[in-house]
Amino acid sequence: MTRPFLFTSLPPSMNRFDRDGRNIGYDYQRRCIASWIDCGFDVCSINAPQEEIPQEFAKLVRVEKTERDASEIAGKPLPYLQDMIDVIVRVTAGSGGFALTNADILLSNETVDISESVRTLRPQECIVEPRMDFAVMDKISEGSLYPSGFDFFAFRAEDARSLSLNRFVFGRPWWDYALPLSACFQGWRRKRIESPFAFHMLHDERWDRKSWTKFGDCFLDEIVLPRAGRIPPDRFFVRYANEVAPQPLNSGFKTRTLKNILNILGFGSRQAMLGRLARLNASMLSRW
């Protein structure tokens, strides 16, 4: 049986600290890679041309390079999301299910055969799942749900051909909203995995307001506003919300949506606008 690919972008180095303050980043990355392989995936790291991953890891995974990097807008040589998708389509020969996840995600197959779930994806069916955060390695099972984004995605390669996400960067804000919402707006169906299987070790946040705002603007320009057209904001976002949900949303959620949307489309500060939009995305995608 063919093993599906899991794609990621391994960094040249990773920092994670245990309860005694020791940097266990290298070992943690090794554990992540081992978990992907143990869960039944062939692993491929997609990196920018000048990025070199540790030799030990390069022996465990396939490494593919993009032709360019996003240094100019991301501040470091990260791959563009669309370039990664193009590589994925090439590596998979344009067919079959594949997974895409962040490099610091540990997978577990204790409660679900996740690679089989990916391998058996039907056309225009996808997996979009959040992670469970944990603080120390020996207490992974005590992790808590991360409510504000998504870390594990799976699609069919022939469907991925239709995605156009040219301005987003893997590893920078908003790509994890842009990818699933693009799929959702094309009418793809979400295949839910009820049992937690993606885990993430907590670390100091490297949140960058400038980067968050910059790519939030890209999200508005590329994902939201093209679908708004000349429809009044309230009507557009009722439709936007209902496109994401398999069933019409209850009136309470619609009301909250409408209260937020005037700010999202230009009233109030840009930061407040993007913050509300991020929360709206997370809420709607959880109902998809």
Outline where the language-model segments fall.
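Short, flexible/disordered intra-domain loops and linkers
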Residues: 14-27, 71-76, 168-171
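Short loop/turn segments at strand-loop or loop-helix junctions that form parts
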Residues: 6-14, 48, 64-68, 104, ...
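Conserved catalytic core of nucleotide-sugar-dependent glycosyltransferases
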Residues: 105-181
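Hydrophobic targeting segments
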Residues: 3-9, 36, 42-45
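Short beta-strand-to-loop acidic/aromatic patch adjacent to the donor-nucleotide binding site
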Residues: 95-108
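C-terminal catalytic/acceptor-binding lobe
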Residues: 4-14, 25, 169-288
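Short, acidic, metal-binding catalytic loop of nucleotide-sugar glycosyltransferases
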Residues: 26-42
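Active-site-proximal specificity loops/subdomain of glycosyltransferases
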Residues: 16, 48-98
